[in-house]
Amino acid sequence: MVSTTLPTQLETIRPGIKAPVKETLLTPRFYTTDFDKVANLVLTLQDEEIEAALEELRADYNRYHFVRNDDFKRSFDHIDGATRLAFIDFLERSCTSEFSGFLLFKELSRRLKNRSPKLAEAFHLLARDEARHAGFINKAMADFGLSLDLRYLTQKRTYTFFPPEWVIYTVYLSEKIGYWRYILMFRHLEKNPDHNIYPLFNYFECWCQDENRHGDFFKALLRSQTALWKTWQSRLWSRFFLLTVFVTHTLTVFERTDFYQSVGLDAKQYNVDVVTNTNATAARAFPEVLDTDNPKFFPRLEACASANEKLTAIANSEAPKLAKFCQKAPWIAVIIWQMICIFLQKPVDAEARRGMVC
């Protein structure tokens, strides 16, 4: 397993302000949606569950959690070289992802305020948490001499349109996979404190509960719309979004093995644990999930990661554009083929097992 080479120098737009990472299929994206359609969602099927999730958000359990303590009042120059670059990359992508959620939720809250007050309040509270997370991570970046200009990101980033149904599927998965990423890393570092190289990780235990609560709200929202779980189309969409999220996660983790090694994690096993747990959690909301126990499942994901490494090496080469295109084509085909094979594997009927899922 070979990690993608990170640049030896980080590009800035002005002193101390890092230039945003180049947009690719793997970088966190900014989204917009059909706000009118969201405003017209009928929630009666899950009214009690949505109200319960809303009460959890109102409680704001982490109101005082994201306060930098004395552990941050020291130099982190010992984190240097490739480890420093990998860690800054991790922080930037995490910050961008959280800020992307903030922008979407803030706009949903604003647009729904006079049309769907309950949803508007929920999105306002979700935006509160995402802004808190993004700001905390951005301050962490400053410990390494850089930060992101979030206003600049707002203005310069490309916005991708997703229908509300896609937003519900993807945000639910994003929050739940975020929960597992944080809690598994926290548990690992709790057992192996020698690998805890930065105090941000100490916040992950409570932090991940924000992700969990956000996911619970989107689960209730998803289950309130029968078209998202009670039709044959919804079964295909569920598998599709699980697949795309898991492939993206696998490619991203394998690209950044240097970072995971720096905190004592085996990137391959970490990916297996995150994907397996997220898939099991998704069975509580989705009508179908992927069969992660299939012996070909993870080898196929890892084949996608290997092909992606080839694509990155080609992209970073000095070959002419036409030559690069020809060299990339077979590796792109490998990724597409492996994804098709995973998608066509026999899924797990979560709806049939609903009463057995904890």
Curated annotation (Swiss-Prot):
Task: Write out the pathway annotation from the protein's UniProt entry.
Answer: Porphyrin-containing compound metabolism; chlorophyll biosynthesis (light-independent)
In Pfam terms, one family for this protein is Rubrerythrin
The record, for InterPro entries, names: AcsF (IPR008434), Ferritin-like_SF (IPR009078), Rr_diiron-bd_dom (IPR003251)
Q: Which cofactor is essential here?
A: Fe cation
What keywords sit in the KW lines?
Chlorophyll biosynthesis, Iron, Metal-binding, NADP, Oxidoreductase, Photosynthesis
Q: Which reaction does it catalyse?
A: Mg-protoporphyrin IX 13-monomethyl ester + 3 NADPH + 3 O2 + 2 H(+) = 3,8-divinyl protochlorophyllide a + 3 NADP(+) + 5 H2O
Q: Give the enzyme's EC designation.
A: 1.14.13.81
Specify the enzyme's EC class, one word.
oxidoreductase
The keyword Metal-binding is annotated on this UniProt entry = yes
Is Lipid metabolism set as a keyword in this record? no
Q: Which PANTHER family match?
A: MAGNESIUM-PROTOPORPHYRIN IX MONOMETHYL ESTER [OXIDATIVE] CYCLASE, CHLOROPLASTIC
The entry assigns this protein to a family as follows: Belongs to the AcsF family.
Q: Which HAMAP family match?
A: AcsF
**Official protein name in the record:** Magnesium-protoporphyrin IX monomethyl ester [oxidative] cyclase 2
Q: Which organism does this record belong to?
A: Synechocystis sp. (strain ATCC 27184 / PCC 6803 / Kazusa)
